[in-house]
Swiss-Prot record:
<feature type="transmembrane region" description="Helical">
    <location>
        <begin position="77"/>
        <end position="98"/>
    </location>
</feature>
<keyword id="KW-0679">Respiratory chain</keyword>
<keyword id="KW-0496">Mitochondrion</keyword>
<feature type="binding site" description="axial binding residue">
    <location>
        <position position="182"/>
    </location>
    <ligand>
        <name>heme b b562</name>
    </ligand>
</feature>
<dbReference type="Pfam" id="PF00033">
    <property type="entry name" value="Cytochrome_B"/>
</dbReference>
<dbReference type="InterPro" id="IPR048260">
    <property type="entry name" value="Cytochrome_b_C_euk/bac"/>
</dbReference>
<dbReference type="InterPro" id="IPR016174">
    <property type="entry name" value="Di-haem_cyt_TM"/>
</dbReference>
<keyword id="KW-1133">Transmembrane helix</keyword>
<feature type="binding site" description="axial binding residue">
    <location>
        <position position="83"/>
    </location>
    <ligand>
        <name>heme b b562</name>
    </ligand>
</feature>
<comment type="function">
    <text>Component of the ubiquinol-cytochrome c reductase complex (complex III or cytochrome b-c1 complex) that is part of the mitochondrial respiratory chain. The b-c1 complex mediates electron transfer from ubiquinol to cytochrome c. Contributes to the generation of a proton gradient across the mitochondrial membrane that is then used for ATP synthesis.</text>
</comment>
<dbReference type="GO" id="GO:0045275">
    <property type="term" value="C:respiratory chain complex III"/>
</dbReference>
<keyword id="KW-0999">Mitochondrion inner membrane</keyword>
<keyword id="KW-0349">Heme</keyword>
<feature type="transmembrane region" description="Helical">
    <location>
        <begin position="320"/>
        <end position="340"/>
    </location>
</feature>
<dbReference type="InterPro" id="IPR036150">
    <property type="entry name" value="Cyt_b/b6_C_sf"/>
</dbReference>
<keyword id="KW-0408">Iron</keyword>
<dbReference type="GO" id="GO:0005743">
    <property type="term" value="C:mitochondrial inner membrane"/>
</dbReference>
Amino acid sequence: MTIMRKTHPLMKMVNHAFIDLPAPSNISGWWNFGSLLGLCLIIQIASGLFLAMHYTPDTMTAFSSVTHICRDVNYGWLIRHMHANGASLFFICLYLHIGRGMYYGSYSYMETWNIGIILLFLTMATAFMGYVLPWGQMSFWGATVITNLLSAIPYIGTDLVEWIWGGFSVDKATLNRFFAFHFILPFIIAAMAMVHLLFLHETGSNNPLGIPSDCDKIPFHPYYTTKDFLGIVLLLAFFFTLVLFFPDLLGDPDNYSPANPLNTPPHIKPEWYFLFAYAILRSIPNKLGGVIALVLSILVLALLPHIQTAKQRSLMFRPISQFLFWLLVSDVFVLTWIGGQPVEPPFIIIGQIASLLYFTIILAFMPIAGLIENKMLKW
């Protein structure tokens, strides 16, 4: 078998990626989230495939087909709740993975980082379209509000929105195409994840110290396969606790009402994992300005390699930058809370301050802190 895995064309690829891969000896549990995201993607594709066998993308029957899955299909309730909560789990792992990349300076690997940002956009698009499919109240109104944002684009906006809708409102054509895109995008995400991994293995992994680790590498198997397996066990324990005991904890009760174009819910909001970006969108009174801020809230990550001023890569020995990083994390939590609140005082001003702080920390405070720390270390 040793000879086989090193010589067979297919086995050789797996061997170089997961078995004989030289890995830094000191990477911590924060490096587990890449493999956990792979597991989340497998769970989502598998559960989604079984749901697609019973789901009908039609405005008249979509809601009842989801009800049918939960009531009549063998273990349909389990598959449905695994898929819905799997999305939440996916985003928890995704945000932790990005946070680790920011903390330890992994954004220095620019190709890997930029493909990661593309993966984030693709995952957000997939999750948004998936939320529309059950055709509940929040599905319908969420789709209407979010797609309508594109009308803020000058000149082509209105035509673009109607083109995406396939008519003059969110209707059967919209649902049909959203289902088609929701089905194909995870496979594109899987392909992009392989490219992400390819570029990562060109440079090798970063480590908590942020220093070159060429002099001290260990084989990926058995050390990190065992470590990843522990992460997988803990993740699945958390996941099935959520699915079996609290399946509706992260959902919206409004989505248990069938979509009604004549009745607007009192408060339209997306799923919890988009609330921070939604709060940034709402904090700007101008429609186009809000859309630009929404896109920039994610795209600002692409600027990180270009605005790095510190001579040290990791934040491990940089106390000022550490403080700012955790301030940013707290700010994202505040934005997530604000995104779920109605648009009224004092939430409006809190949202505006938190949005301003979000961009200021990343674009101004972090680079300035890097320069100060260089001076402190006499670099």
